[in-house]
Structure formats: structure tokens, C-alpha cells
């Protein structure tokens, strides 16, 4: 069978051209109809699309899914060519194609709308995303800030925690202290109640000022702050303050009293020192030169205490100085030499002050007589020393001077006031004054002389006795002697004569101390006389009488061993009286051997003094060969002194024999003349002008030798023995005068 298209083609081919034209017109008509149908369907789709857009998006997918099959069905129907009209095949195909195109366009439009919507929503979401990102950044910044705040807060927390711990510890301590203070306050209240003390009141309930308030803080071993202690003390000062003021006032009064007593004691010390200065001027200390003595002598011119106080002080100081003299006799001799040499170059008023220290013991008119005679004796001594230096002979001088008394050293000070002049004229003037004072006062002179001798002995007694006992004996003897003597002219004569004798006798003091048989009495006053010594011969008897009495009194004070040796020495003296003596040359040689330590200055002085003395002694030996009746007793008394001295005396005694070169017989003639003169004139011992001076010179030489023994062998003697010696001296003096 054939197809319809083949059949139609066969018909066209069969028809005429006219038939072909009509067929084409019908095809064009069909095509136009189909286009119109498509446009109508498109409009309907658009209308439906608008409705879909107005619906929610949920329903959009559902509607689209429902419409698609319909559209697809319509399009498929149109595209299938299955039209309701029977037409050609071309018309049906075109109608389906258009419908499908329209549906595709509608779906495209919908997809584009959906895309647009998706793009809008995407942009919105993007905006939201950026917003959220910004918010996240800000939140992160806030988080960092918060983290920093958290760290700071943690640090502060730690600090606060530590501070809290400290505060907690301090709080615990304060609580403990608070408990202690509370306990202390409780104890304080208990103490106050116990003692009945009311604070902040001037009067206590019990009427007593108790110190318990100040001691409350120390009662218990608890700790109390300074404020509380100050409060307690301030509260306690109410009653206790007055007591403290009273104690302070008492202390002030005691201090003022002590100052006044110190001032009084300081004022008394210069007075004591003035008394001691007088004695220091009288005695040259060992190791001290005459130049050093002068300031002390000047200081003694100042006013001091009463004469009685001076006497006691001088006695004590003399005893102490006698001990120092015994220890170093060599220094004493050397100081005497230097004092003499210095005295010839300078004339000073110091000797009067030196002598005044010891002579102040004599009061009344005696002091005036002493002053007059001291000036005369010092003038005569100065002349004698100058003459001694003018001669160029040598005299031995021992290194040791034994038993020098403070009087000897005192007179050494007086040598410094030596002036030129005729010595014999001075002696005559002194003798005139002595004779005037001695007329009718023989008994009183003897008593005063014995008193003075005993004073000299008692001063040396201080070596063995205590100072208190010595002062007691000395005061008793002074009072007894002053009551017995109505006038002290004789004493003045004796003291001044002794001063002159000491000045002349110093170079020969050691030589006087001889062996028991050697004649020890040498008149130092003979040094001043030349070949014709007639005046000296006339003045020597009375001096020897005084010398004899003085030596006897001092020998009486020796110990029992010394008294036993007197008889032996008298016998030896008689046997050795006529013994030959060494020559002056041999004596000078021996002295040069014995004195190796003596300086050149001392040797020159000794040579000059020796020549002068030998020139004075030789004429006397020729003119006075007679013996005196009492000369042996005097020699025996002189020998008893050096027997107790040191062993150095033996060597010196041999020199004495050579220096003396005389026998005891040569000195007895003037004594006999003096006894005759005394018998003719009665109580007046001698009126020759120079007798007193000569007697003092020889008497003091014996006194020096006796005192050397006294210082060596004295033990403690009582005042009774001194009184017995005074009586014995009186009786012996009467015997010699008869």
C-alpha cells in the first residue's frame, strides 16, 4: 500500500498549476493559525507565571513540576502534528514546535528569575557574613582586653593576699601584746589597790613616799611599751618628785662642804711648807748644790705661822734631813766646798734667812743678840775664807764627813755672805758684845747652853726614835729650859761662836776625828793669824773651857758602850800624848793618796786652807808649851765621839796626827790662863774680846766629832737622861771654872 504523501504528490503532479496554487494558499493559512495559537498559549503561560511568582517559593517547585508535564503534553501534542483538523502534515508540525518553544522560553524566564533571586540572596548572605566577621573581630579585641584585666586582677589578688597575710600576722601580734598589756594593767591595778596608792594625788593614803609606782613595769616579765612606762613614771612623780628634790639639795650641800674643806686644807699646806723651808735653808740636802738652795731661802721670807709651830716643824724636818746626811756624807762635803766657792763671788742676804729658820726657837731679846753676832761672825768668816784662798798650801781632806748636824749645814749657808775686813777686829767687837751680855748671867748662860746642846742631840736622836716621841721630849725640854733661863745672852754667844767655829772648821772636820791617842782639838780660828798669833793665844783658853763643857755634855748622851770606852781612851790619850807626829809633807802625801776622787777645785781650796792653818798653828805650839789642868778631860771627851763612827775614821786619824803635829801639852797653857782670869773676875768667865769666838770655834769642832758618834750609835733615849745630862754639865762647868 502507498503512503498518503505519495498520493498527494501524485495529485499535485496531476493537477494543474492552478491546483498547486490553492494548496500553497491553504498551507499558509494553517501556518498563520498555528502561530496565533502559539501566541495565545504564551500569554496564558505568562499569566500563570505571574501567579506562580506571587505564591510562596514552596509551591513554586510543585507547580513547576505539575505544569511541566502539561506543557510538555501540549507541546508534544502540538509538535506531534496531531491536530484536530485534518490538514496537511506541515501545519501540525509547526504548531507543536511553536508550543514547545514557548514552553522552553517560559522555563528559561523562570530559571533566570530564580537565578536573579539566588544572586540577590547570595549578596545578602555575603553582607551578613562580613557583618558577622566584623563582630567577631571586635569580640576578639574585647576578649584580649578582658584577658589583660584578668591577669592584672590576678596579680592584685596575689598582692592583696600577701598583704592580708601580713596584716593577719600583725593582728595576731597585736592581739598578744594587747593581752599582755591588759594583764599588766590588771597587775598595776592590783598593786595600787594593795599599797593603797591613789594616782594623781600629792599625798598617799599610807602617808609614805613609795617607789613601787616606778617599779610596777618591772614586776612581771611582760613587755611594756614606752608610752605606758612614761605614763606610769609621770603619774608616780606626783609624790616622789619632792623626795628627789630633797636628795639633790642634800648632795649640793655636801659638795659645797667638801669644797670648803679642800680650800681650808690648801691654805694650811703653804703654812706647813714655810716652816719646812726654814729647815731646808739650814740644811743642805745630799745631791743638792748651793745654787739650788737660793730659791728656797727666798721663799722663807714670806710671813708664816707662829714661832711655836715653826719650832715643831723644824724639829721634824731636821730629823729627816739628818738621816739623809748620814747616808751620803761625801755629797755634804762637796756641797760645802761649792757653797764656799760660790759665796766668795756673790754677796746675798740669804744667810740671814737660813739662820733665822733654826734660831727662831729662841724668843725675846735673844734673837737680837743672835742677829748682831751673826753679822759679825759672817764678816769675819768671809775675811778668813779669802785669806785661806790666798795661800798655796795643801791640806788633806777626807772623803767622808761624819755626823754633821743641821747647824753645820746651816752655817755653810752663812759663808755666802763673806766681806772683807780684819778678822781680829771683828772678833774684838763680837767679844765686847758677848761680855756685856754675859755679866752677871753665868748660871743662866750655862743652863741655856746645856739646853741648846741637848736640842742638838735630840735632833740627831730622831734616827732611832719616832717623830711623835721626839716632839714630846723636845717641847718639854724647851719649856723647862726657857723657864730656868732669865736671859739668853749666853746662849746667843754659844750659838754664834759655834757658827763661826763651823765655818772655820769645815776643811778640818774629818781630821778632827782621830785615833784614841791623837789630839783632836784644833782651833780653826787660828787659821786667820800669821806668825805672831798673840791674840789667838789669849782668846783660846776661854774657848777651850766652853768647848770642854760642850763636849762633856754631848759625850754624856752616848750609849753605855761609849761610856765604857772613855776610860780606855783617857789612858791611851796620856800614853800617846808625847808620841812624835808626822811632818806636814808626809801628811800632804797621805791625803793625796786618800782623796783620789776629790776634784781639782777642791784640792786647790784645801791647799790654800792648809797653808793658812799650819802658819797659824806653829806659833801657838811654840808659845804655849804648858799643859792645862783639865785638858785631858776635854781630849778624852773629844775622843769618845768618833769611836762610834764608821771605820773610815782610822785612816783620817793618821792624817790628823800629821796635820796637827802638836801634843796635848801644847794646848794646856791658855786653859790655865783662862782659869786664872775666871778666878779673878768671879762669875765673869772671860772679858777678852775674842774669847767667845775662839771658844765657839773649838767647841764646835769637838761638837762635830761627838755628833758623828751620836748619829752612829744612838738608840731611843728618854727625856730623863737629857735632864741628868744638863745637871752633869753644870757641875762639870763649875769644876772647870774653879
UniProtKB/Swiss-Prot annotation:
Keyword Ribonucleoprotein: no
Pfam families recorded: LRRFIP (PF09738)
GO molecular function: DNA binding; DNA-binding transcription factor activity, RNA polymerase II-specific; DNA-binding transcription repressor activity, RNA polymerase II-specific; protein homodimerization activity; RNA polymerase II cis-regulatory region sequence-specific DNA binding
GO CC annotation terms, alphabetical: cytoplasm; nucleus
N-acetylthreonine found at: 2
Record-listed Phosphoserine modification sites: 16, 83-84, 88, 92, 302, 346, 348, 551, 560, 675, 701
GO biological process, one term: regulation of transcription by RNA polymerase II
Keywords, ordered alphabetically: Acetylation, Coiled coil, Cytoplasm, DNA-binding, Isopeptide bond, Nucleus, Phosphoprotein, Repressor, Transcription, Transcription regulation, Ubl conjugation
InterPro entries the UniProt entry points to: LRRFIP1/2 (IPR019139)
Subcellular localization, as worded in the UniProt entry: Nucleus; Cytoplasm
Compositional bias per record (Low complexity), positions renumbered to this chain: 78-94
Residues covered by region (Disordered): 40-98, 253-738
Subunit structure: Homodimer. May also form higher oligomers. Interacts with FLII. Interacts with MYD88. Competes with FLII for MyD88-binding, even in the absence of LPS.
PANTHER family: LEUCINE RICH REPEAT IN FLII INTERACTING PROTEIN (PTHR19212), LEUCINE-RICH REPEAT FLIGHTLESS-INTERACTING PROTEIN 1 (PTHR19212:SF5)
Its biological purpose: Transcriptional repressor which preferentially binds to the GC-rich consensus sequence (5'-AGCCCCCGGCG-3') and may regulate expression of TNF, EGFR and PDGFA. May control smooth muscle cells proliferation following artery injury through PDGFA repression. May also bind double-stranded RNA. Positively regulates Toll-like receptor (TLR) signaling in response to agonist probably by competing with the negative FLII regulator for MYD88-binding.
UniProt-recorded name of the protein: Leucine-rich repeat flightless-interacting protein 1
Organism: Rattus norvegicus (Rat)
Encoding gene per record: Lrrfip1
Amino acid at each position: 500500500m502507498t503512503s498518503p504523501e505519495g498520493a498527494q504528490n501524485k495529485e499535485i503532479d496531476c493537477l494543474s498549476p492552478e491546483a498547486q496554487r490553492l494548496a500553497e494558499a491553504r498551507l499558509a493559512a494553517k501556518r498563520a493559525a498555528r502561530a496565533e495559537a502559539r501566541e495565545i498559549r504564551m500569554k496564558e503561560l505568562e499569566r500563570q507565571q505571574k501567579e506562580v511568582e506571587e505564591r510562596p517559593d514552596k509551591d513554586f517547585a510543585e507547580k513547576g513540576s505539575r505544569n511541566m508535564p502539561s506543557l510538555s503534553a501540549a507541546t508534544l501534542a502540538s509538535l506531534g502534528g496531531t491536530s484536530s483538523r485534518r490538514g496537511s502534515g506541515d501545519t501540525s508540525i509547526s504548531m507543536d514546535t511553536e508550543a514547545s518553544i514557548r514552553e522552553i522560553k517560559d522555563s528559561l524566564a523562570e530559571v533566570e528569575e530564580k537565578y536573579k533571586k539566588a544572586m540577590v540572596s547570595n549578596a545578602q548572605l555575603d553582607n551578613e557574613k562580613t557583618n558577622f566577621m566584623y563582630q567577631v573581630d571586635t569580640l576578639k579585641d574585647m576578649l584580649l582586653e578582658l584577658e589583660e584585666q584578668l591577669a592584672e586582677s590576678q596579680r592584685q589578688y596575689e598582692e592583696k593576699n600577701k598583704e592580708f597575710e601580713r596584716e593577719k600576722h600583725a593582728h595576731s601580734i597585736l592581739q598578744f601584746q594587747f593581752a599582755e598589756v591588759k594583764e599588766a594593767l590588771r597587775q598595776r591595778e592590783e598593786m595600787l589597790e594593795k599599797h593603797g596608792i591613789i594616782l594623781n594625788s600629792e599625798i598617799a593614803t599610807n602617808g609614805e613616799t613609795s617607789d613601787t609606782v616606778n617599779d610596777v613595769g618591772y614586776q612581771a616579765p611582760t613587755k611594756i611599751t614606752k608610752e605606758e612606762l612614761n605614763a606610769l613614771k609621770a603619774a608616780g612623780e606626783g609624790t616622789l618628785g619632792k623626795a628627789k628634790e630633797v636628795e639633790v639639795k642634800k648632795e649640793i650641800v655636801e659638795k659645797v662642804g667638801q669644797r670648803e674643806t679642800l680650800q681650808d686644807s690648801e691654805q694650811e699646806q703653804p703654812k706647813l711648807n714655810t716652816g719646812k723651808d726654814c729647815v731646808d735653808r739650814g740644811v743642805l740636802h745630799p745631791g743638792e748644790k748651793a745654787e739650788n738652795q737660793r730659791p728656797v731661802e727666798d721663799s722663807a721670807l714670806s710671813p708664816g705661822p707662829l714661832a711655836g709651830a715653826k719650832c715643831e716643824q723644824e724639829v721634824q724636818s731636821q730629823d729627816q734631813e739628818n738621816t739623809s746626811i748620814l747616808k751620803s756624807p761625801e755629797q755634804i762635803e762637796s756641797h760645802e766646798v761649792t757653797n764656799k766657792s760660790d759665796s766668795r763671788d756673790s754677796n746675798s742676804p740669804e744667810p740671814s734667812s737660813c739662820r733665822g729658820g733654826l734660831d727662831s726657837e729662841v724668843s725675846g731679846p735673844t734673837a737680837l743678840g743672835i742677829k748682831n753676832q751673826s753679822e759679825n761672825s759672817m764678816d769675819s768668816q768671809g775675811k778668813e775664807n779669802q785669806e785661806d784662798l790666798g795661800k798655796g798650801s795643801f791640806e788633806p781632806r777626807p772623803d767622808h764627813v761624819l755626823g754633821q748636824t743641821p747647824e753645820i749645814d746651816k752655817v755653810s749657808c752663812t759663808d755666802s755672805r763673806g766681806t772683807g775686813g780684819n778678822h781680829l777686829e771683828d772678833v774684838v767687837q763680837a767679844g765686847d758684845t758677848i761680855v756685856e751680855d754675859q755679866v752677871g748671867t753665868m748660871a743662866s748662860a750655862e743652863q741655856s747652853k746645856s739646853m741648846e746642846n741637848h736640842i742638838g742631840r735630840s735632833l740627831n736622836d730622831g734616827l732611832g726614835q719616832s717623830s711623835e716621841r721626839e716632839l714630846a721630849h723636845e717641847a718639854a725640854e724647851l719649856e723647862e729650859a726657857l723657864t730656868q733661863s732669865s736671859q739668853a745672852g749666853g746662849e746667843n754667844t754659844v750659838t754664834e761662836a759655834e757658827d763661826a767655829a763651823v765655818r772655820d772648821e769645815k776643811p778640818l772636820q774629818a781630821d778632827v776625828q782621830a785615833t784614841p791617842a791623837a789630839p783632836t782639838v784644833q782651833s780653826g780660828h787660828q787659821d786667820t793669824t800669821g806668825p805672831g798669833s798673840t791674840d789667838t793665844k789669849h782668846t783660846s783658853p776661854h774657848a777651850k773651857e766652853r768647848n770642854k763643857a760642850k763636849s762633856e755634855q754631848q759625850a754624856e748622851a752616848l750609849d753605855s758602850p761609849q761610856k765604857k770606852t772613855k776610860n780606855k781612851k783617857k789612858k791611851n790619850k796620856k800614853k800617846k800624848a808625847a808620841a812624835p807626829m808626822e811632818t806636814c809633807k808626809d801628811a800632804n802625801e797621805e791625803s793625796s793618796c786618800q782623796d783620789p776622787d776629790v776634784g781639782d777645785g777642791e784640792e786647790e781650796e784645801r791647799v790654800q786652807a792648809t797653808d793658812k792653818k799650819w802658819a797659824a798653828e806653829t806659833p801657838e805650839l811654840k808659845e804655849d808649851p804648858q799643859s792645862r789642868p783639865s785638858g785631858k778631860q776635854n781630849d778624852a771627851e773629844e775622843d769618845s765621839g768618833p769611836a762610834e763612827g764608821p771605820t773610815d775614821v782610822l785612816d783620817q786619824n793618821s792624817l790628823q796626827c800629821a796635820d796637827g803635829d802638836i801634843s796635848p801639852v801644847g794646848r794646856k797653857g791658855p786653859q790655865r790662863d783662862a782659869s786664872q782670869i775666871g778666878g779673878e773676875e768671879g762669875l765673869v768667865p772671860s772679858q777678852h774680846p775674842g774669847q767667845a769666838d775662839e771658844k765657839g770655834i773649838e767647841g764646835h769642832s769637838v761638837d762635830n766629832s761627838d755628833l758623828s758618834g751620836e748619829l752612829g750609835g744612838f738608840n731611843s733615849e728618854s727625856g730623863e737622861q737629857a735632864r741628868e745630862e744638863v745637871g752633869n754639865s753644870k757641875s762639870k762647868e763649875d769644876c772647870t771654872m774653879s
